[in-house]
Curated annotation (Swiss-Prot):
Task of the protein: Catalyzes the dephosphorylation of 2-phosphoglycolate.
GO cellular component: cytosol
Family indicated by similarity: Belongs to the archaeal SPP-like hydrolase family.
A Pfam family of this chain: Hydrolase_3
EC code(s) of this entry: 3.1.3.18
GO molecular function, one term: phosphatase activity
Catalyzed chemical reaction(s): 2-phosphoglycolate + H2O = glycolate + phosphate
Binding of Mg(2+), residues: 11, 13, 176, 180
Protein name: Phosphoglycolate phosphatase
Species the sequence originates in: Halobacterium salinarum (strain ATCC 700922 / JCM 11081 / NRC-1) (Halobacterium halobium)
Organism lineage string: Archaea, Methanobacteriati, Methanobacteriota, Stenosarchaea group, Halobacteria
HAMAP family given in the database record: GPH_hydrolase_arch (MF_01419)
């Protein structure tokens, strides 16, 4: 694929957002003008990432639920199974705890392969129950995500890349959290924004001083320089 810009995999929360989690409007035109495939890779459920693509005016190419679900070329790919996750959720509530998002629970309503639990809930209890069911917990800084250890953005990327006629190694990635580590390991070039956690900073090829949306824009400048 001969494009001016390399394929780009980019996180949402903490990377395209401001500190208050609202999307930095400046990033939308950058995504729209990117001369290469853009894959939005997030821990959010699929509809949120698809909506972002639609609002930005770009093709809907998405890795969601930390690699549990992907959408590309009108094809929906699943890399996880919800049965063990549902058992953890039930056991957590049976132990007297709450998932933490209220009765409507818009955080998990459209999830298919993992569970997101509020960070106000006890991590030790959640981690123990997850381990009992062969799962583990990733703290993204926004929620505790219960999922299979093998399920990640980085492990989902090769299947998405193949459908775009490129490889995972052709991609540049920008992110901010522990759930971006495997993505950084899978791509050819990686950037952690300045607000990234230590896991992401340790895995990234380049750590930027600029934070949040400013960090993404700084990464774009470096990629294009």
């Amino acid at each position: 694929m001969d494009t001016a810009d390399p394929p780009l995999a980019v996180d949402i929360d903490g990377t395209l957002s401001r500190a208050d989690r609202s999307i930095d409007g400046r990033v939308l035109d950058v995504l729209r003008g990117w001369d290469g495939p853009v894959v939005v890779a997030t821990g959010k459920a699929l509809p949120y990432a698809v909506a972002l693509c639609q609002f930005a005016g770009i093709d809907e190419r998405v890795i969601a639920e930390n690699g549990g679900v992907a959408y590309v070329g009108d094809e929906l790919l699943h890399f996880g199974d919800s049965r063990a996750v549902e058992q953890v959720a039930a056991a957590f509530e049976d132990a007297g705890h709450d998932i933490g998002w209220g009765d409507a629970d818009l955080t998990n309503r459209w999830r298919e392969t993992e569970l997101a639990v509020s960070r106000e809930q006890p991590l030790d209890v959640l981690s123990a129950l997850a381990a009992d069911h062969g799962l583990h917990v990733v703290d993204t800084g926004f929620a505790y995500h219960v999922k299979p250890e093998s399920m990640s953005k980085g492990n989902a990327l090769p299947a998405v890349a193949a459908r775009l006629g490129v490889t995972a190694g052709d991609f540049v990635a920008v992110g901010d959290s522990a759930n971006d580590v495997e993505l950084f390991e899978a791509v050819g070039e990686s950037y952690a924004v300045g607000n990234a956690d230590d896991h992401a900073k340790g895995a990234a090829e380049t750590v930027l001083s600029e934070t949040h949306g400013d960090g993404f824009l700084a990464a774009v400048d470096r990629i294009r320089s």
